[in-house]
Amino acid sequence: MTTLKTMTRVQLGAMGEALAVDYLTSMGLRILNRNWRCRYGELDVIACDAATRTVVFVEVKTRTGDGYGGLAHAVTERKVRRLRRLAGLWLADQEERWAAVRIDVIGVRVGPKNSGRTPELTHLQGIG
């Protein structure tokens, strides 16, 4: 049986991304791509809001505690610049054109401070 203590960072990240995808779809977004990669990096989740024709690039941060700071500390200006670059590369490769583009961060907290409870999700919209 896999527990939080025995999970690898990759497994923990995959669990957080799955929870984030479930949340996004429950909010009415359609998932276009997961773990899109190119030579410059990776985009965790790419979703769209069909009602507003907005494409949303989502960075997912999964934490088991506050050891590395909160969600605001997890996404630096450098990380936002990287996400913008990756989003631009993804968009350049698409035939569809979008009315708007947004970069969001979803924080997923699991683990000791959240033991026995449903994972806590925090959604920051339009960070860059």
Curated annotation (Swiss-Prot):
UniProt GO MF annotations: nucleic acid binding
Among SUPFAM superfamilies, the record links this protein to: Restriction endonuclease-like
The signal sequence is none
Q: Report which residue ranges the record marks as coiled coil.
A: none
Q: Which InterPro entries match?
A: Restrct_endonuc-II-like, tRNA_endonuc-like_dom_sf, UPF0102_YraN-like
> Which family is it part of?
Belongs to the UPF0102 family.
Question: Protein name, please?
Answer: UPF0102 protein MRA_2923
Q: What is the species listed in this Swiss-Prot or TrEMBL entry?
A: Mycobacterium tuberculosis (strain ATCC 25177 / H37Ra)
Upper taxonomic classification of the species? Answer: Bacteria, Bacillati, Actinomycetota, Actinomycetes, Mycobacteriales
